[in-house]
A protein has these predicted regions:
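Extended, aromatic/histidine-rich regions of cofactor-dependent oxidoreductases associated
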Residues: 1-260
């Protein structure tokens, strides 16, 4: 009759503020194709997990948002209840939604001289559907207010596709992985990496990748910069799951001032 694993960790001594999460037992016992396993983590890179990171023991659900990876684990129950009792479920969130693919900017010049090239950088979260490319678009804000309102609607796919989109460059894997790894090398047997410690493909699902683009100069004016992802299935952000309660995926918009 086992159907669900329910667990929670220590946050404070108030039972009303208990932070709970749960998983179907099938996800605990078997991994979807290409996905890492659900684990109880007590060490990271050979060192005991610090309290800041959720130690002494933390649940890690690789393809899920953070509320599934409960810190400071204290209780774990096996249940025949089919329904999720997650704390986030009580707040009208989709607790079974896996990570989405989306992108955002990291560095955008707020003031730019007219007709001079400028660079924009950002990162992309690579969800379960992978990442094919990152695209950017610049729109002059002199468009009519009605048209601007249609373009500002991140869920209006027709308006977004009417813009001119240019592919950015997805940067290669880092040469230094950090984390005090021996010889700065990903250990053999790590999911997604070959025997030499190099990624089998890039970007890796359930990771983040950096992107960059050098844009040509623009005439003086006020502009809106947008960036979006296209996943391995060809779905364009915020699709295929544009719902806010299923995780963040809206198309970021940044204002740019180009001065003469």
């Amino acid at each position: 009759d086992l159907r669900r694993v329910i667990y929670f960790g220590y946050h404070n001594d108030d039972p009303a503020q208990r932070f709970r999460s749960s998983l179907p037992v099938g996800r605990v016992l078997e991994d979807p194709f290409g996905m890492p396993p659900v684990i109880l983590c007590y060490k990271l890179n050979g060192e005991f997990l610090t309290p800041e990171r959720g130690g002494p023991v933390r649940v890690v659900v690789p393809e899920a948002y953070g509320f599934k990876s409960i810190k400071w684990l204290t209780h774990l129950y096996l249940s025949n209840n089919h329904a999720a009792n997650d704390t986030y479920a009580e707040q009208n969130n989709d607790v079974d939604s896996p990570l989405k693919t989306f992108c955002e900017t990291l560095s955008v010049p707020r003031s730019i001289k007219a007709n001079e090239p400028f660079a924009v950088t950002g990162y992309a979260q690579v969800g379960i559907s992978g990442l094919q490319r990152v695209e950017v678009s610049i729109q002059n804000k002199s468009v009519t207010r009605d048209q601007e309102q249609r373009d500002d609607d991140a869920e209006n796919e027709d308006s977004a596709n009417a813009l001119d989109w240019t592919a950015a460059t997805i940067l290669p894997p880092p040469k230094q992985w950090g984390g005090s790894l021996p010889d700065n090398r990903i250990p053999e047997g790590t999911i997604g990496f070959d025997s030499s410690g190099e990624p089998k493909s890039w970007p890796i699902r359930l990771s983040k990748a950096h992107w960059a683009i050098l844009l040509p100069g623009l005439p003086a004016g006020t502009y809106v910069f947008r960036s979006r992802t296209v996943d391995q299935n060809g779905a364009v952000q915020p699709m295929p799951r544009p719902f806010r309660n299923s995780g963040r995926a809206h198309v970021e918009q940044v204002s740019l001032e180009v001065t003469s």
